[in-house]
């Protein structure tokens, strides 16, 4: 209603001016009868009121819609007047176009993810062949090849997960998961990595705590942090701690290493995509995508992750989980 | 002798699996015509089927359903697909187990054994006590028992596992990494120093048995067995 009055303020003002003009015109023309003058003024105001009432009746849908908060993309029926139905049509058209664009983009994204998945699977077969061929061989050359193959496998996995992340909403399942079992399976799947770099994990778990999460995604995220920790500990320290602390309503997992640490100017940006920092330059093999994925995944899973480090002494990454739903 | 049928469109993987399984005493059959997998199955009557999902013509799920109409033999899927859905589909279409690529020989062998044990029972299980032998030295893997001629020696679980790997590989160099990996069990594992200790202990046990085998260190590479004449 306010909006309606405001948008017709000029009209009302105009009518009032006109009224005053007519009033004074007749007054100075010699018509000094108040009853006549007020009659003319009254008729004019009545006509104005009639017009406004008519407009309000016809267009009230639009004004209600405009002044209400926007919830969703639906447009209510606006009214039957020419103005209203035209506006309605136009809006619908616009929404249709937007939807179409959105669908096209989504379809493209889908196709991209499918392509990526297929591509990864295609590469996995020759990788399996290489693996099978060199599995029984232990000479240094083959150890080297094994190491490189492992690197490719890690890369593929990261690729797979980062492309799936865009469709996360369709690909996750929150359930009660035992954190210690999850950690054990992480350790199991990275054991070759630990051996290669001679860094040994140690688990300190308070009790067997259940957390609510998606096991697959969380495993991947922890795996990323663990591989980082191992990579930056190699040759400096052979310890990697996986500590679990339990609070009343939170469970905290700390992945603590005694490696090279992260320079203080880099620590704020380690979760940024493609940010590699000084360690990235010093150690190569860094894409700057791993920790970014970790952050994205933990956000989506409703966990938090933070990182602290002192250069030369080590790094600790802390995941925090709600223990209750 | 158990017969394994391999249905896999990558020729390399097929060949490697075939070699490996034959080395471990299995008979193998491969299906090379992917439009007639069922015919091969019915003709050869294998004990276990290894089945890829992505195949030309029909996919693995289809063949699994076809085979299931005639037989209940164990079917193990092997596929590069890593999604949960694919594994669920595999089991729901009648598969018994699922191996994800890239895989290791050990996994394939272990899963085949377990399927045979489950499907054909005692008969196969009895055959299955694993004995590893090198230069007359025998290791009874399941009992952690080392034998040479009439002498016996008990080993710990870790020692037995280490020696199993060493005996199997014999003169081939075995890297420290491999030994560590084979003995790794969740968060209980052998690091470099402990590995040295274990090797020393194994050498002592072999000496006590008067076994004509010695564990030689190969500098920078690992260990190898040498038979003394």
Swiss-Prot record, chain A:
It is found in: Cell membrane. GO terms for biological process: phosphorelay signal transduction system. Residues 30-33 are extracellular. It catalyses: ATP + protein L-histidine = ADP + protein N-phospho-L-histidine. SUPFAM superfamilies: ATPase domain of HSP90 chaperone/DNA topoisomerase II/histidine kinase (SSF55874). PROSITE patterns: HIS_KIN (PS50109). GO terms for cellular component: plasma membrane. The keyword Chaperone does not apply. Its EC number is 2.7.13.3. GO terms for molecular function: ATP binding; protein histidine kinase activity. Disulfide bonds: none annotated. Keywords: ATP-binding, Cell membrane, Kinase, Membrane, Nucleotide-binding, Phosphoprotein, Transferase, Transmembrane, Transmembrane helix, Two-component regulatory system. Residues 118-325 form the Histidine kinase domain. Pfam families: HATPase_c (PF02518). Probable member of the two-component regulatory system YxdK/YxdJ. May activate YxdJ in response to the antibacterial protein LL-37. This is Sensor histidine kinase YxdK. The lineage of its organism: Bacteria, Bacillati, Bacillota, Bacilli, Bacillales. The gene is yxdK.
Swiss-Prot record, chain B:
Keywords: Activator, Cytoplasm, DNA-binding, Phosphoprotein, Transcription, Transcription regulation, Two-component regulatory system. One of its GO terms (biological process) is regulation of DNA-templated transcription. Phosphorylated by YxdK. One of its GO terms (cellular component) is cytosol. Residues 3-116 form the Response regulatory domain. The modification 4-aspartylphosphate is found at residue 52. PROSITE patterns: OMPR_PHOB (PS51755), RESPONSE_REGULATORY (PS50110). Pfam families: Response_reg (PF00072), Trans_reg_C (PF00486). Probable member of the two-component regulatory system YxdK/YxdJ. Positively regulates the expression of the yxdLMyxeA operon by direct interaction with its promoter region. Could also indirectly regulate the expression of the dlt operon. PANTHER family: REGULATOR OF RPOS, TRANSCRIPTIONAL REGULATORY PROTEIN YXDJ. This is Transcriptional regulatory protein YxdJ. The lineage of its organism: Bacteria, Bacillati, Bacillota, Bacilli, Bacillales. The gene is yxdJ.
């Amino acid at each position: 209603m306010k909006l309606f009055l405001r948008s017709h303020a000029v009209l009302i003002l105009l009518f009032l001016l006109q009224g005053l003009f007519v009033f004074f015109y007749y007054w100075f023309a010699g018509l000094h009868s108040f009853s006549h003058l007020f009659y003319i003024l009254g008729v004019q105001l009545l006509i104005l009121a009639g017009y406004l009432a008519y407009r309000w009746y016809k267009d009230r849908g639009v004004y209600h819609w405009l002044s209400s908060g926007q919830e969703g993309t639906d447009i209510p029926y606006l009214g039957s007047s020419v103005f209203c139905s035209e506006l309605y049509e136009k809006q619908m058209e616009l929404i249709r176009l937007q939807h179409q664009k959105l669908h096209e983009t989504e379809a493209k994204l889908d196709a991209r993810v499918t392509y990526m998945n297929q591509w990864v699977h295609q590469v996995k077969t020759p990788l399996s062949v290489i693996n099978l061929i060199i599995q029984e061989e232990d000479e240094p050359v083959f150890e080297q090849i094994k190491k490189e193959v492992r690197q490719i496998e890690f890369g593929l996995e990261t690729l797979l997960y980062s492309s799936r992340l865009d469709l996360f909403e369709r690909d996750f399942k929150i359930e009660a998961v035992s954190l210690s079992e999850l950690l054990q399976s992480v350790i199991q799947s990275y054991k070759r990595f630990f051996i290669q770099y001679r860094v040994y994990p140690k688990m300190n778990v308070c009790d067997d705590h259940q957390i609510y999460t998606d096991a697959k995604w969380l495993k991947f995220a922890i795996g990323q942090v663990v591989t980082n920790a191992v990579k930056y500990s190699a040759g400096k320290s052979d310890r990697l701690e996986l500590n679990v602390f339990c609070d009343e309503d939170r469970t905290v997992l700390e992945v603590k290493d005694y490696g090279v640490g992260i320079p203080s100017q880099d620590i704020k940006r380690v979760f940024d995509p493609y940010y590699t920092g000084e360690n990235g330059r010093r150690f190569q093999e860094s894409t700057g995508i791993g920790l970014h994925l970790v952050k994205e995944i933990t956000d989506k899973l409703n966990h938090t992750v933070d990182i602290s480090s002192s250069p030369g002494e080590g790094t600790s990454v802390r995941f925090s989980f709600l223990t209750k739903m | 002798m158990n017969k394994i049928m391999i249905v896999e469109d990558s020729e390399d993987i097929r060949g490697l699996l075939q070699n490996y399984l034959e080395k471990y005493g299995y008979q193998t059959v491969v299906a090379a015509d992917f439009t007639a997998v069922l015919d091969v199955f019915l003709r050869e009557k294998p004990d276990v089927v290894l089945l890829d999902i992505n195949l030309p013509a029909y996919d693995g799920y289809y063949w699994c359903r076809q085979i299931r109409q005639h037989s209940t033999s164990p079917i193990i899927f092997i596929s590069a697909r890593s999604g949960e859905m694919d594994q669920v589909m595999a089991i729901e279409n009648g598969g018994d187990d699922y191996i994800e690529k890239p895989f290791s020989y050990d996994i394939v062998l272990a899963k085949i054994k377990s399927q045979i044990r489950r499907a054909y029972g005692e008969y196969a299980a009895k055959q299955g006590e694993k004995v590893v032998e090198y230069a007359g030295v025998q290791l009874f893997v399941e009992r952690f028992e080392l034998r040479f001629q009439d002498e016996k020696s008990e080993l710990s679980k870790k020692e037995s596992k280490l020696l199993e790997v060493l005996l199997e590989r014999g003169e081939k160099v075995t890297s420290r990494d491999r030994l560590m990996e084979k003995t790794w069990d969740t968060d209980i594992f052998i690091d470099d120093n402990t590995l040295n200790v274990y090797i020393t202990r194994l050498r002592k046990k072999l000496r006590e048995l008067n076994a004509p085998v010695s564990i030689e260190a190969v500098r920078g590479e690992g260990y190898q067995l040498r038979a003394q004449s």
